From Swiss-Prot:
GO biological process, one term: fatty acid biosynthetic process
Function: Transfers the 4'-phosphopantetheine moiety from coenzyme A to a Ser of acyl-carrier-protein.
Recorded GO MF terms: holo-[acyl-carrier-protein] synthase activity; magnesium ion binding
Record's protein name: Holo-[acyl-carrier-protein] synthase
E.C. designation(s): 2.7.8.7
Residues given in the record as Mg(2+) binding sites: D9, E63
Species per Swiss-Prot/TrEMBL record: Burkholderia pseudomallei (strain 668)
Top EC category: transferase
Lineage start: Bacteria, Pseudomonadati, Pseudomonadota, Betaproteobacteria, Burkholderiales
Annotated compartments: Cytoplasm
This protein's encoding gene: acpS
Family indicated by similarity: Belongs to the P-Pant transferase superfamily. AcpS family.
C-alpha cells in the first residue's frame, strides 16, 4: 500500500453554527449521513455547543476526504455518501456508501482520519491509501 492522497480541512465553528441557524437545521440534514445525523441530534440535545462542534468536525472530515481522494465535492463524492463515525475507543473512521463505496473499492482505496475541535475551529486530516500501482498511476509515476 502507498499513499494515494492527503487532505486537510479547517472549519470555523461559528460559521457552521451560522449556516445551521440560517437554514433552520437543513444544513445538517444535507451534509450528514444517517448515522452521523443521529449522533448530531443526540449531542445537540445534551449541549448545543457539542452538537455544533460535531457538525463542524464532520463537515471538515468530508472536505478533507474529498481532497485526499482528489475529487473535491464531485461525483461520486457527495456529502451523505461518506460518514465519519467513532469506534467504542473513540477512534474516528470513515465509511462510504453507494457509488462512492464502489468507486473506492474498485481502486482499493482505504483511508485513515483524525478529527479535533476547540471552541473556535474543527480540523481534520485524512490519509488515503491504495495499492502501489494505483497510487503510482495517480501521482504520474511510472508503474
Amino acid at each position: 500500500m502507498a499513499i494515494y492522497g492527503i487532505g486537510t480541512d479547517l472549519a470555523q465553528v461559528s460559521r457552521i453554527a451560522a449556516v445551521l441557524e440560517r437554514t433552520g437545521g437543513r444544513f445538517a440534514e444535507k451534509v450528514l449521513g444517517p448515522d452521523e445525523l443521529r449522533v448530531f441530534h443526540a449531542r445537540r440535545a445534551r449541549s448545543e455547543a457539542r452538537g455544533i462542534a460535531f457538525l463542524a468536525t464532520r463537515f471538515s472530515a468530508k472536505e478533507a476526504f474529498s481532497k485526499a481522494i482528489g475529487l473535491g465535492m464531485h461525483w461520486p463524492m457527495t456529502w451523505r455518501a461518506l460518514q465519519t463515525l467513532n469506534r467504542p475507543s473513540g477512534e474516528p473512521y470513515v465509511i462510504a456508501s453507494g457509488e462512492l463505496a464502489a468507486w473506492l473499492d474498485a481502486r482499493g482505496i482505504t483511508a485513515r482520519v483524525t478529527v479535533s475541535d476547540e471552541r473556535d475551529y474543527a480540523v481534520t486530516f485524512v490519509v488515503a491509501e491504495a495499492p502501489d500501482d494505483v497510487a503510482a498511476a495517480r501521482s504520474g509515476a511510472a508503474s
